[in-house]
Amino acid sequence: MATIKDVAKMAGVSTTTVSHVINKTRFVAKETEQQVLQAIKNLNYSPSAVARSLKVNTTKSIGMIVTTCETPYFAEIIHSVEELCYRQGYSLFLCNTQNNPEKIKNHLDMLAKKRVDGLLVMCAEYTQNSLNLLATFEDLPMVVMDWGPFNENTDLIQDNSFSGGYIATKYLIDNGHKDIAIISGELKKTTAVMRYQGFEKAMQEANLAINPDWIMEGFFEPEDGYECMNKILVQDKLPTAVFCCNDVMALGAISAIGEKGLKVPDDISVIGYDNIHASRFFSPPLTTIHQSKSRLGVQAINLLFKRISEKGKEHEIIEIYPELVIRKSVKTL
């Protein structure tokens, strides 16, 4: 394997000059630069990433801590982040935590040893243990995505789940629905609470009662939508519409409704949340709340790149607002 000394010898220059050409740390005459680059090409020389990182104080790598990469919502965001990192010449270290504080600690320790240039954090919930762990890495440029907490040491991208819950519920009300159920996430989790509070505000503004028997909690999985919807369907009185707090729970709810011989939206309307790629292919195509996954990912990684290059600047909060996507799963009464 060729070394930097081999390149210097072939190009007729010093190893210091070769280093300056590779790292672009000092002006080198064009002719000399071409000689070095040609020698690198001829010898198929690949500079040591570790050695380069020590000299220029960068590893061209980003760490990303996520709850999981399996759900469609997270997967779409991760894809946009990875794509932009690739275009910018950065490697992405993706770490799944399942919200386990021990895993978070181990992943953070590993990323610190890798000397990543910055960190993206996107977890479904932030326990106090998790927050304490993140606080110990305050010197590392960090952007917290989606529903994370804000502190003076991090930048934050906010997704406005409260607004999304309000928009979804108001759309049902504007279409004549008064008897509205909600299939939420766990109401001890931030994102579920915010979407529920948006639902609650819209119902209160319209002077509509919230039936406690129609408030269901799941874990944002299709099985939860299915099981929660079945619990609603065995009741004497049925809602005319259901707000499912993510699209995959809406898929489960639609399946349960169909198994009972009922139709969406003829018998029960369904609105989802997230606008995952598959939602337009549901039967019927799902009316939902659009939260741009690609925009969230792009905003986050661009903010992190900015933080890496401008470490002394004041930290920022960037808000992304959800939008209604109307398809065919809600009926006008």
From Swiss-Prot:
Task: Kindly list any coiled-coil regions of this protein.
Answer: none
Record keywords: DNA-binding, Purine biosynthesis, Repressor, Transcription, Transcription regulation
Q: Which GO terms describe its molecular function?
A: DNA-binding transcription factor activity; transcription cis-regulatory region binding
**Which pathway does the UniProt entry assign to this protein?**
Purine metabolism; purine nucleotide biosynthesis [regulation]
- Output the superkingdom of the source species: Bacteria
Record bears the keyword Metal-binding: no
Q: Which residues form the HTH lacI-type domain?
A: 2-56
Residue ranges of the DNA-binding region?
Answer: 4-23, 48-56
List this protein's GO terms for biological process. negative regulation of DNA-templated transcription; purine nucleotide biosynthetic process
Q: Record's Gene3D superfamilies? A: 3.40.50.2300, lambda repressor-like DNA-binding domains
Q: Specify which residues bind hypoxanthine according to the UniProt entry for this protein.
A: Y73, K189, T191, F220, D274
Keyword Calcium attributed = no
Entry-linked InterPro entries: HTH_LacI (IPR000843), LacI/GalR-like_sensor (IPR046335), Lambda_DNA-bd_dom_sf (IPR010982), Peripla_BP_I (IPR028082), Tscrpt_reg_HTH_PurR (IPR023588)
Q: How does it assemble?
A: Homodimer.
Q: Which PANTHER family match?
A: HTH-TYPE TRANSCRIPTIONAL REPRESSOR PURR-RELATED, LACI-RELATED TRANSCRIPTIONAL REPRESSOR
The UniProt comment on domains reads: Consists of two structural and functional domains: an N-terminal DNA-binding domain, approximately the first 60 residues, and a larger C-terminal domain, approximately 280 residues, which imparts the function of corepressor binding and oligomerization.
The UniProt entry, under HAMAP family, shows: HTH_type_PurR (MF_01277)
Q: What does this protein do?
A: Is the main repressor of the genes involved in the de novo synthesis of purine nucleotides, regulating purB, purC, purEK, purF, purHD, purL, purMN and guaBA expression. PurR is allosterically activated to bind its cognate DNA by binding the purine corepressors, hypoxanthine or guanine, thereby effecting transcription repression.
Kindly provide the name given to this protein in its UniProt entry: HTH-type transcriptional repressor PurR
The organism is Histophilus somni (strain 129Pt) (Haemophilus somnus)
